[in-house]
């Protein structure tokens, strides 16, 4: 395949044929066939360690979800939720050895589904902070060390494969092809995205101001 690749422009192929050879050669190279035996051994070790770390990361995420529930002691804080929802939270607390309390279990998503319904701002803040802190609380399920290891292993693997960094390795087979092209595209999109975000922010602020005024409470940004 390497011989065909090196002579692809002299084989009388059409554009599709040349592209096919280039594709096969790229797959050949990214599979590590151009590496020395020592490099192949190291790549194998990296892949094995990455698989282990990825599995551990996922297990930690699930454990954090199960151990990051927000506990509420005053039913009044749950204003905005239906009686049925509150009953579910009470049962969850009871099932976890906390009768008389309310347990808001987190879900494995960025946004927690109960946030839009809860009127109490302080409770919304507690839920949000508990959600974003998952995996970085310094406990046995903290994923920061794993992320650091995976980042270093990705960089090492990319270097062995002949790429300047993991981003270049990952993008080589994508439409953008390289980090520079991605950064150029993002820089072109950024002004419009920022302007739109500010516009949406103004709409949300007006909504907050209106709702707080209706409640007779001070607004917030």
Residue locations for each model-derived region?
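Active-site-proximal, well-structured secondary-structure segments within enzyme catalytic domains
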Residues: 16, 20-22, 49-52, 59, ...
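Short His/Asp/Glu-rich catalytic/ion-coordination signatures at enzyme active sites or charged loops
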Residues: 3-45, 105-145, 149, 153-196, ...
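Elongated amphipathic alpha-helical scaffolds of membrane-associated proteins involved in membrane
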Residues: 28, 35, 39-43, 50, ...
């Amino acid at each position: 395949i390497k011989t065909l690749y090196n002579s692809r422009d002299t084989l009388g192929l059409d554009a599709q044929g040349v592209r096919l050879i280039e594709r096969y050669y790229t797959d050949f190279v990214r599979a590590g066939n151009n590496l020395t035996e020592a490099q192949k051994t190291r790549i194998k070790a990296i892949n094995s360690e990455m698989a282990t770390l990825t599995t551990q990361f996922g297990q930690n995420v699930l454990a954090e979800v199960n151990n990051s529930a927000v506990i509420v002691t005053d039913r009044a804080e749950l204003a905005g939720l239906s009686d049925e929802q509150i009953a579910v939270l009470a049962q969850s607390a009871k099932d976890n050895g906390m009768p008389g309390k309310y347990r808001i279990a987190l879900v494995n998503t960025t946004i927690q589904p109960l946030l839009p319904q809860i009127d109490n701002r302080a409770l919304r803040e507690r839920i949000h902070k508990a959600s974003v802190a998952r995996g970085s609380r310094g406990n046995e399920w903290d994923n920061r060390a794993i992320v650091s290891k995976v980042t270093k292993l990705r960089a090492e693997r990319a270097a062995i494969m002949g790429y300047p960094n993991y981003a270049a390795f990952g993008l080589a087979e994508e439409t953008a092809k390289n980090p520079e092209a991605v950064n150029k595209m993002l820089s072109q999109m950024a002004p419009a995205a920022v302007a739109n975000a500010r516009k949406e922010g103004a709409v949300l602020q007006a909504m907050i101001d209106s709702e707080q005024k209706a409640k007779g409470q001070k607004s917030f940004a």
